A protein has these predicted regions:
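A glycine-rich, often tryptophan-bearing local segment used as a flexible ligand/cofactor-contacting loop or short
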Residues: 95-193
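Bacterial N-terminal signal peptides that target proteins for export
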Residues: 1-9
Length: 303
């Protein structure tokens, strides 16, 4: 059977136009900031105005073709609601199945499962800062829960399903201080802006439950840091991983307003969004054992 050369050319042109249109389509991003636990100033609405972080994201979206939806309403989560987004960003806290601190509508158990299914099915997911302080294993109920001794344990495959999807979990933080982080993969989208090392004032989370397939992007240098919580081996602050068919990206930074103002943080976040949404490609091979072999050895619990 012979193909008509004109039809072949026409088909190629149409395919090219289709692919160009697809690549030119804005990434549809949900920025979800319900705080059932501690409510950070960068996500708080004051006098009905957008939050600090929402204003930063709005400016980024205008320059980089992102279609943003801002929400604190957990009751909206369903397969149909999540289907309209390419990337879901969580800057959240606490047990989102409870109304909690910000008094915004809670998620349902079915809504939480819809999120997990959406990511496993191919949606991009991004966790920022207290996105790792969300759905702690064995901690139910709203409010800013006290730090409990149980957080200083790795639960592995018994950890909450959300934590297993994210690839890590918040334990506690010490006093804000200037600290250094070593960049592991400068070729990953957004990381080139950091150079080979990041050094800033921030609230540095201690973390656990690192997944075996985490691809660490930068690692906190704990040597010389002040406070008992940092008397442990270096561990990742940011990573990328796959979860089912989905791409997951996390960055523990983002507590302070000046971090959100920092062009390096913005470039890093944009790279994460574009990678998670499939606009940019990069390998996310597991490397945590090689670059942070002691990461899952936790600090000693001290009340």
């Amino acid at each position: 059977m012979k193909l008509n050369p004109k039809l072949v050319v026409l088909g190629s042109l149409l395919l090219g136009l289709y692919l160009n249109a697809m690549s030119a389509a804005p990434l549809r991003v949900l920025y979800f900031t319900k705080s059932a636990g501690y409510e950070h100033s960068v996500v708080k609405h004051v006098d009905g105005k957008p939050s600090y972080s929402e204003n930063i994201l709005t400016a980024l979206a205008a320059k980089h073709d992102l279609a943003l939806t801002f929400s604190k309403d957990g009751s909206l989560f369903s397969p149909e609601y999540l289907a309209q987004f390419d990337v879901i960003i969580f800057y959240t806290s606490g047990d989102l199945l409870s109304v909690g601190t910000d008094a915004q509508p809670a998620m349902t158990a079915a809504g939480k499962q819809a999120l997990l299914d959406a990511v496993a099915g191919g949606k991009g997911f991004i966790g920022l800062h207290s996105g790792s302080d969300t759905f702690h294993t064995g901690e139910q109920g709203g409010g800013n829960n006290p730090i409990r001794a149980q957080r200083f344990t790795n639960y592995g495959d018994k950890a909450d399903d959300y934590i297993r999807m994210l690839g890590g979990e918040f334990i506690r933080h010490g006093a804000q201080q200037v600290a250094k982080a070593r960049v592991i993969d400068p070729a990953f989208p957004g990381c080139a802006a950091l150079g080979d090392r990041l050094e800033v004032m921030e609230e540095w989370y201690t973390l656990k439950e690192f997944a075996a397939n985490d691809h660490a992007l930068f690692v906190l240098d704990t040597a010389g840091m002040e406070g008992a919580d940092y008397q442990r081996a270096s561990y990742p602050l940011a990573w990328a991983r796959t979860h089912g068919k989905g791409r997951v990206w996390f960055n523990a930074m983002g507590h302070r307003e000046d971090i959100w103002d920092n062009p390096k943080f913005q470039a890093l976040l944009l790279g994460g969004i574009e990678w998670a949404g499939g606009r940019l490609t990069a390998e996310a091979k597991p490397n945590i054992e090689a670059v942070a072999p002691g990461a899952n050895t936790l600090q000693v619990y001290k009340p």
